[in-house]
From Swiss-Prot:
GO terms for molecular function: pyrophosphatase activity. InterPro entries: Nudix_hydrolase (IPR020476), NUDIX_hydrolase-like_dom_sf (IPR015797), NUDIX_hydrolase_CS (IPR020084), NUDIX_hydrolase_dom (IPR000086), RppH (IPR022927). Its cofactor is a divalent metal cation. Belongs to the Nudix hydrolase family. RppH subfamily. Pfam families: NUDIX. A motif (Nudix box) lies at residues 38-59. Accelerates the degradation of transcripts by removing pyrophosphate from the 5'-end of triphosphorylated RNA, leading to a more labile monophosphorylated state that can stimulate subsequent ribonuclease cleavage. This is RNA pyrophosphohydrolase.
Amino acid sequence: MIDRNGYRANVGIILLNSKSQVFWGKRARQNSWQFPQGGIKSGETPTQAMYRELAEETGLQPVHVEILGRTREWLRYDVPACWTRRDWRKNYRGQKQIWFLLRMLGRDCDVSLKTCAHPEFDAWRWNQYWVELESVVEFKRQVYRLALTELSRLLDHETCLGNDQAYREPLEPVKELEEKSSDARQG
């Protein structure tokens, strides 16, 4: 669904574990990291789209998470023309997103990146709430900052303590999904 201003309705998901660390997925066959996100289909509410995207990209079901909150307004970013599907270029400017903050109630083993034919991610990791965003594709970074900042109001003080040092801790090197799986079996 693209609105009259050229923005596709979308949801973004910031998923926390019990240590208030954030889920990051590595884009399949790319060297960039991002949060789960995806388009809102016709007839879907943002909440319904969030649960569908969560299941498609992480394998998690509603029973595995609780909603802590969402952004008050749509957050927007423009997508460079070179990243846009050719048939969309006339009317498409970018994405407008409602961001959800979720707490994971399930376990790490509930996460599965292979729930659909073309997975979005080929690796995942937990990281601190406030990290550098260099590993995020450049045109999404400002929206990530806005979403993290707005939703941080829902977190306890200790989790947000690093706000003045936000985005200074880099994402650690990739740990591939297969390595995680074999480590879990050996341990």
